[in-house]
């Protein structure tokens, strides 16, 4: 934190998973794209030990609204990990709690957006949803809130899906301005 390193803001959930994996000592240096997040998910699954996740307690992260756009504030999540380490909690259990907090926080943000926009459907897309545990937890939270959940099945959920969606939007926009 106090070094001369260049640290940039990011809107990528993946960077938050990378940070959590490093803080917990699960994966300090990636040797391939997505490795820290993959190792963090594996640790969370180990904590489950084949059991079903029970979402009791208050694992909701904090979010703040900037320019009427809700954003997840990572500071309380990082502090919770550090406090857990200090208390001697196993890294695997903290990885699971991190997943639960991200799912709960994301569901809360999605619910707020749905209410504001008057919609009841949420599409889950992006590389973070390669994480099957996060996908299951968030889907459960959204459905419990009465929201329909869309997840791509014929295109990949990661950047391939995002690129496909961008191409579809571009095609629609071009069709609107092109002469008939």
Task: Locate predicted features.
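Short, small-residue-biased leader/transition segments that mark boundaries at the very start
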Residues: 1-7
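A short glycine/serine-rich beta->alpha loop
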Residues: 8, 93-97, 150-157
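Conserved phosphate/anionic-ligand binding catalytic regions in large, soluble enzymes, centered on
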Residues: 8-27, 31, 160, 165-166
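Glycine-rich beta-strand-to-loop/alpha-helix junction loops that act as flexible
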Residues: 13, 122-129
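A mobile "lid/hinge" subdomain adjacent to the ATP/sugar-phosphate binding pocket shared
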Residues: 61-90
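Adenine-nucleotide phosphate-binding core of ATP-dependent small-molecule kinases
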Residues: 82-113
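Conserved phosphate-binding/catalytic loops in two-lobed NTP-binding clefts
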Residues: 120-122, 132, 138-162
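Glycine-rich phosphate-binding/hydrolytic loop that grips phosphoryl groups
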Residues: 150-180
């Amino acid at each position: 934190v106090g070094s001369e390193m260049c640290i940039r803001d990011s809107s990528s959930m993946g960077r938050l998973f990378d940070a959590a994996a490093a803080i917990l000592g699960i994966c300090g240096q990636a040797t391939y794209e997505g490795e820290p997040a993959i190792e963090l998910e594996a640790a969370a699954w180990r904590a489950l030990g084949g059991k079903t996740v029970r979402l009791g307690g208050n694992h909701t992260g904090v979010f703040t609204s900037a320019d009427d756009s809700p954003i997840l504030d990572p500071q309380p999540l990082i502090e919770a990990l550090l406090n857990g380490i200090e208390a001697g909690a196993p890294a695997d259990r903290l990885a699971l709690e991190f997943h639960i907090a991200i799912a709960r926080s994301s569901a809360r943000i999605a619910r707020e957006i749905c209410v504001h926009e008057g919609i009841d459907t949420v599409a889950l897309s992006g590389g973070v949803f390669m994480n099957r545990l996060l996908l299951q937890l968030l889907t459960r939270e959204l459905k419990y809130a009465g929201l329909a959940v869309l997840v791509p099945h014929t295109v990949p959920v990661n950047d391939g899906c995002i690129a496909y969606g961008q191409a579809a939007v571009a095609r629609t926009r071009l069709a609107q301005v092109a002469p008939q």
